[in-house]
A protein has these predicted regions:
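Short phosphate-coordinating micro-motif centered on Lys-Gly-acidic
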Residues: 1, 82-85, 91-147
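Phosphate-binding P-loop
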Residues: 19-25
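Conserved lysine of the Walker
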Residues: 38
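P-loop (Walker A) phosphate-binding loop of NTP-binding proteins
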Residues: 33
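Short beta-strand-centered segment that lines the nucleotide-binding/catalytic pocket of NTP-utilizing
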Residues: 51-66
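N-terminal pre-Walker A segment at the start of P-loop NTPase domains
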Residues: 1-17
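Hydrophobic anchor at the beta1->P-loop junction of P-loop NTPases
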Residues: 28-30
């Protein structure tokens, strides 16, 4: 499904709609250029779970926000040029049953966690604040997913 947003607050609201449909063991993969809105979308997702103060974990790779469920925000950008074992060594799969994951730059790594995930690609739109999102539901868990 393709979605267009024209402002930062629309991206945040879209994230909240996505987040309202998530449950433990769900994984959302975000791909897009730097500054495309991945973190804003993540902030919206987290807001639907009652979380605030979400920042990009670029330099620390991941942030675990404890709760029921846990919310794990991963920025895998720094791992893109490394081996897959560097991602698996971080042992995220042990958190999967009780956590919701959002993984920026996660396409090369998602298969180590699950074969069912929501894949969102974000591209620049026609103006500075507009973005186009291509949302692909992968696996049976996501059948019937709609926004």
């Amino acid at each position: 499904m393709k979605i267009s947003v024209n402002a930062v607050d629309q991206m945040h609201q879209l994230g909240a709609k996505i987040g309202a449909q998530l449950k433990p063991s769900d994984v959302v993969v975000l791909t897009g250029d730097l500054g495309s809105g991945k973190t804003v979308l993540t902030q919206g997702i987290a807001s639907s779970l009652g979380l605030s103060d979400i920042t990009s974990p670029t330099f620390v790779i991941s942030r675990i926000h404890k709760g029921t469920p846990n919310f794990i925000h991963i920025d895998a950008y720094r791992l893109l040029d490394s081996s897959l074992s560097n991602f698996t060594d971080l042992d995220f799969e042990s958190y999967l049953p009780n956590s919701i994951f959002v993984i920026e730059w996660g396409a090369p790594f998602v298969a180590t966690l699950t074969d069912q995930y929501l894949d969102i690609k974000i591209t620049q739109g026609e103006n500075e604040n507009s973005r186009s999102l291509e949302v692909t539901a992968v696996g049976q868990r996501w059948q019937g997913f709609n926004l």
